[in-house]
């Protein structure tokens, strides 16, 4: 009700399906943050038991100088796709995980849908990669490239969807 009133004051409206899409996008972003920004072991029961007992740091931070030395600056996307295996799987996963970011940003905020998806994918991926520097997660240029392309692909899918369901 609050959002509906606020939109009405601005002379705008949003249907139930659009609001459901917004809710799904928020839930997806929360899941994406849980998957990418927190340390890999953060969600384990052992970590919580040890942290709550005071035997382990709740949210350990990695020194920036240490993280910067481990960044993979050379793109290996094509090589990973050619060779397949784990690298190929991760390349495809990085592309697909950001399709919803591009799709929902293009769906929810009007304008050039592909460009909106590309920019949102890039900015979100850049923020994730930057935050990963501080929590001991791997950061590399491939993630930024593939996540950005995934956002663009999501924007393109939204463009197709908009032609199929123009009133959504």
Regions found by a protein language model. Name each.
Residues 139-161:
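Alpha-helical transmembrane segments that form the membrane-embedded catalytic/substrate-binding core
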Residues 1-136, 156-168:
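Bulky hydrophobic segments
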């Amino acid at each position: 009700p609050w959002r509906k009133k606020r939109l009405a004051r601005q002379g705008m409206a949003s249907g139930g399906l659009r609001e459901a899409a917004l809710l799904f996008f928020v839930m997806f972003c929360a899941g994406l943050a849980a998957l990418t920004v927190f340390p890999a072991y953060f969600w384990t029961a052992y970590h919580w038991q040890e942290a709550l007992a005071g035997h382990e740091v709740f949210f350990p931070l990695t020194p920036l100088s240490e993280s910067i030395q481990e960044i993979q600056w050379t793109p290996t996307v094509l090589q990973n796709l050619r060779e397949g295996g784990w690298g190929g799987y991760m390349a495809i996963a990085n592309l697909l995980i950001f399709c919803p970011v591009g799709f929902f940003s293009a769906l929810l905020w009007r304008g050039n849908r592909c460009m909106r998806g590309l920019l949102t994918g890039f900015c979100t991926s850049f923020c994730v990669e930057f935050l990963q520097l501080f929590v001991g997660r791997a950061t590399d240029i491939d993630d930024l490239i593939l996540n950005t392309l995934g956002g663009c692909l999501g924007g393109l899918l939204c463009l197709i969807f908009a032609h199929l369901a123009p009133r959504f």
